Curated annotation (Swiss-Prot):
GO biological process, one term: arginyl-tRNA aminoacylation
Protein name as it appears in the record: Arginine--tRNA ligase
InterPro entries: aa-tRNA-synth_I_CS, Arg-tRNA-ligase, Arg-tRNA-synth_N, Arg-tRNA-synth_N_sf, ArgRS_core, DALR_anticod-bd, Rossmann-like_a/b/a_fold, tRNAsynth_Ia_anticodon-bd
Species for this entry: Shigella sonnei (strain Ss046)
Gene (UniProt): argS
Record's subcellular location: Cytoplasm
Length: 578
């Protein structure tokens, strides 16, 4: 149930009946304050002048045509021409009942789309570090939300599995295998492995020459070199899968669509762009000049798609990637969770994609960029020694801190239960601290804040959920008994909680459209706060009679279900007790 969409359509029809153009925007928003109702329509300001009226005159005209019978108990004009809408308690009660009767909590299913989501994208032969965290968990929250809404989602893990460095890595792997026969390498070895390979490449000309030859052989499809390359990819992705599972993200090996996937397409794309007159030779390289992007001299910027030596660039791969996602995966929409520093690069690749007709304008290519993770000093998050923080080390520390926190509060908890709870709290805290911030901004990584039981944090939200569940344990009532009971809304706090519960679909819709999980976090935090106020002022177990008691239990029940489902769309685990 999307009340905002329902009201928007009703107000729009009334505006048209009052003389507004058919494309008018009613601008229905949640009211900022309770005294202004549940929703407010602000669209009169933009339209009134065109009709030769004041916004208030238009609002008065709109009210004569606005039929919200059975939806609103009161509609009034405020200020210069805002329309305040107060939802009818009977309408709220009816839709709370409907939400409780549905596994989806009354959330409708939009028209199904095929949506490709590009996220995580670690590099082969390197361990995942904190720089991969944001893309991985924000992208996964978007995927979970889109799937819940009923879309077909294709996860695309654009792994860095190709490039000239693989000659060097294969040469070093070969040397290691000869010297350490039978030893299986793990990724922890690969961190040092990469450094050692690079050191030899820089210092040993014979090794460097061999590495360069290996690149040529790998790129020509030689089976021995392909096998060595696959071994490096397998070692990396096996280790990365452990991290994905610890993070409770939904990526698997089946979702890997590395850079190498697009290699066979690159020569054809360069030839096609030349044939279309979009790409030209410039100083030996193949270049596309884009009028939309200017260099320092104010001339169209040249984007190289093939180097003088015949090698291809990331841009060429990204052009092929977009083409593949439309033509082969049949995407209706493509979302890229890549940091903001890549924005111009992506815009240039997509400008070429559009000019070449590889992806029509009707299929959105969206860069859902994000800022950086910073330390308390406001600088990029590093180890004390100034190095890159490995993601596995960060998760180990989260678990250790959560273990201490949980043990302090529950000294008698059995060890296995403590470990399970510490994992939910620790991993949840790291993820929620990131997801609760607007992805477009940088954010400060702070252990004390993220593990606090106050404020908009995972531990607070997990505790809020267990608090609602505890009401049911005390009530000793089964779900069948409760299902038959009516919902009655008489108190203001009951109405405020019910109205917020029924805004779950609106919140999901915003997250799906904008790729902004922080909107869901803000909604759930607000919901938990409203439940707190309701619980304090509207006695549940000691209500004046059974009818009121059961009605309030149903509001508590929908609160618990909404918190659990909302946190699940974020990939945050809930627990029964804390």
């Amino acid at each position: 149930m999307n009340i905002q969409a329902l009201l928007s359509e009703k107000v729009r029809q009334a505006m048209i009946a009052a003389g507004a153009p058919a494309d008018c925007e009613p601008q229905v928003r949640h009211s900022a304050k309770v005294q202004f109702g549940d929703y407010q329509a602000n669209g009169m300001m933009a339209v009134a002048k065109k009709l030769g009226m004041t916004p208030r005159q238009l609002a008065e005209q709109v009210l004569t045509h606005l039929d919200l019978n059975g939806i609103a108990s009161k509609v009034e004009i405020a200020g210069p021409g805002f329309i305040n809408i107060f939802l009818d308690p009977a309408f709220l009660a009816e839709h709370v009942q409907q939400a409780l009767a549905s596994d989806r909590l009354g959330v409708s299913t939009p028209e199904k789309q095929t949506i490709v989501v590009d996220y995580s994208a670690p590099n082969v032969a390197k361990e995942m570090h904190v720089g991969h965290l944001r893309s991985t968990i924000i992208g996964d929250a978007a995927v979970r939300t889109l799937e819940f809404l009923g879309h077909k989602v294709i996860r695309a893990n654009h792994v860095g599995d190709w490039g000239t460095q693989f000659g060097m890595l294969i040469a070093w792997l070969e040397k290691q295998q000869q010297e350490n026969a039978g030893d299986e390498m793990e990724l922890a070895d690969l961190e040092g492995f990469y450094r050692d390979a690079k050191k030899h490449y820089d210092e040993d000309e014979e090794f460097a020459e061999r590495a360069r030859n290996y690149v040529v052989k790998l790129q020509s499809g030689d089976e021995y070199f392909r096998e060595m390359w696959r071994k490096l990819v397998d070692i990396t992705m096996t280790q990365n899968q452990i991290t994905y599972d610890r993070l409770n993200v939904t990526l698997t090996r089946d979702d890997v669509m590395g850079e190498s996937l697009y290699n066979p397409m690159l020569p054809g794309i360069v030839a096609d762009l030349k044939a279309k007159g979009l790409a030209v030779e410039s100083e030996g390289a193949t270049v596309v000049f884009l009028d939309e992007f200017k260099n320092k001299e104010g001339e169209p910027m040249g984007v190289i798609i093939q180097k003088k030596d015949g090698g291809y660039l990331y841009t060429t791969t990204d052009i092929a990637c977009a083409k593949y996602r439309y033509e082969t995966l049949h995407a209706d929409r493509v979302l890229y969770y890549i940091d903001s520093r890549q924005h111009q690069h992506l815009m240039q690749a997509w400008a070429i994609v559009r000019k070449a007709g590889y992806v029509p304008e009707s299929v959105p290519l969206e860069h859902h960029m994000f800022g950086m993770m910073l330390g308390k000093d406001g600088k990029p998050f590093k180890t004390r020694a100034g190095g890159t923080v490995k993601l596995a080390d960060l998760l180990d520390e989260a678990l250790e801190r959560a273990r201490r926190l949980v043990a302090e509060k529950n000294p008698d908890m059995p060890a296995d239960e403590l470990e399970k709870l510490a994992n939910a709290v620790g991993i949840g805290a790291v993820k929620y601290a990131d997801l609760s911030k607007n992805r477009t901004t940088d954010y400060i990584f702070d252990w004390d804040n993220m593990l606090a039981f106050e404020g908009n944090t995972a531990p607070y939200m997990q505790y809020a959920y267990t608090r609602v569940l505890s009401v049911f344990r005390k009530a000793e009532i089964n779900e069948e008994q409760l299902a038959a009971a009516p919902v009655i809304i008489r108190e203001d706090r009951e109405a405020q909680l019910a109205a917020r519960l029924l805004q779950f679909e609106e919140t999901l819709t915003v997250v799906a459209r904008e790729g902004t999980p922080h909107v869901m976090c803000a909604y759930l935090y607000d919901l938990a706060g409203l439940f707190s106020g309701f619980y304090e002022h509207c006695p549940i177990l000691s209500a004046e009679n059974e009818e009121v008691r059961n009605s309030r239990l149903k509001l508590a029940q929908l609160t618990a279900k909404t918190l659990k489902l909302g946190l699940d769309t974020l990939g945050i685990e809930t627990v029964e007790r804390m």
